[in-house]
């Protein structure tokens, strides 16, 4: 669970759920790229007033759960994350640049939403953490028939 950030003139708890797709939705975020992105985000935390509460990767997009301060605009948070991660991924994994012929790692678009402190923060954190994993659906009734059982 996130903590309140105490600054000289305010106390806050602002959390954003950010989703950034790769350029052309290319499937390039494999194990090594996933680890590279997470390591880069640790460096971003050290240099900027933003804290990554959770990072979840799928093959063609990344979910970030980020806590920041009111002085940082949401678009600047996204811009910082996307620019630094792209530059460092290309530097540490030059073969990725060949797969993305336009020279950009991320698309220009993104999704961003605020996350409430109470119940939704844990729900979104769980969702972000489980990115890229197979969905586990619970079957309610073992004898339950489906629409196409007879076919």
Annotate each language-model stretch with its function.
Residues 1-151:
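Basic nucleic-acid-binding interfaces
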């Amino acid at each position: 669970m996130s903590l309140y950030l105490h600054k000289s003139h305010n106390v806050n708890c602002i959390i954003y759920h950010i989703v950034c797709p790769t350029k052309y939705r290319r499937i390039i975020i494999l194990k090594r790229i996933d680890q590279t992105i997470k390591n880069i985000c640790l460096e971003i935390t050290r240099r900027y007033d933003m804290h990554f509460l959770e990072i979840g990767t799928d093959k063609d997009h990344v979910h970030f759960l980020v806590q920041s301060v009111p002085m940082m605009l949401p678009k600047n948070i996204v811009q910082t994350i996307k620019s630094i991660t792209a530059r460092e991924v290309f530097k540490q994994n030059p073969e990725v640049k060949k797969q993305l012929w336009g020279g950009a790692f991320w698309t220009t678009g993104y999704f961003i939403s605020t996350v409430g402190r109470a119940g939704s923060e844990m729900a979104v954190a769980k969702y972000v953490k489980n990115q890229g994993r197979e969905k586990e659906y619970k079957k309610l009734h073992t004898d339950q028939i489906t629409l196409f059982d007879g076919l």
